[in-house]
Amino acid sequence: VERKQPDLVLIVARSFATKLATPTLITDARGDLVYFNDAAAELLGRSYLDIGELPVSRWQELFEPRTLDEEPLTPEQTPSGIALLERRPAHGSFAFRGLDGRDHEITVTAFPLLSRPDEVVGVMSIFWEPPAGP
C-alpha cells in the first residue's frame, strides 16, 4: 500500500500547532487524526507519541464524543466534521472522555485547511475547557 505524502498545508499547520499553548489537533481530508500538540495531550490523556495517527472511526470510539446532554455525537456533528464537510469554520461545545478516564467539556473552533480554493486537505481544531462557573 502506497502512502501519500502529507500536503504542505498539513505540514505547516502541524508546525504551527507545536508552538501553541492552546490545545490543537489536526485531521486530514478523511477526518483521520494526524496530529495533536502537547497542550491537547493533557486533555486527551496521552501524548501524540503514544497514540500516533488514528482513523476517524478509531478516535471517535476512543474519546466517545457526546453532547453536553450526554447524547452521542457522530464525527459529522462535531465542529471539525462540520468544517471538513461544509468547508467552513465551525464552533461548538461538547464532552468527551480522555484516555486517562477523565471526562471533559470543551469548546472548539475548527476551520478547514485549504491547499487551493476548492481543495480541503484537513481541519485544524483549537479547543479549551471553559472556566468553571461561580
Regions found by a protein language model. Give the residues of each.
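PAS and PAS-like sensory/regulatory domains
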Residues: 92, 99, 104-108
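N-terminal capping loop/helix in small sensory signaling domains highlighted by a polar->aromatic N-x2-3-F motif
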Residues: 37-41
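Flexible loop/coil segments at beta-strand boundaries within sensory signal-transduction domains
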Residues: 98-102, 114-119
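PAS-family sensory domains
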Residues: 79, 97, 108-111, 118-130
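Sensory modules in modular signal-transduction proteins
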Residues: 4-29
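Terminal output helix/cap of sensory domains in signal transduction proteins
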Residues: 12, 51-98
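Conserved hydrophobic beta-strand signature of PAS-family and PAS-like sensory domains
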Residues: 33-34
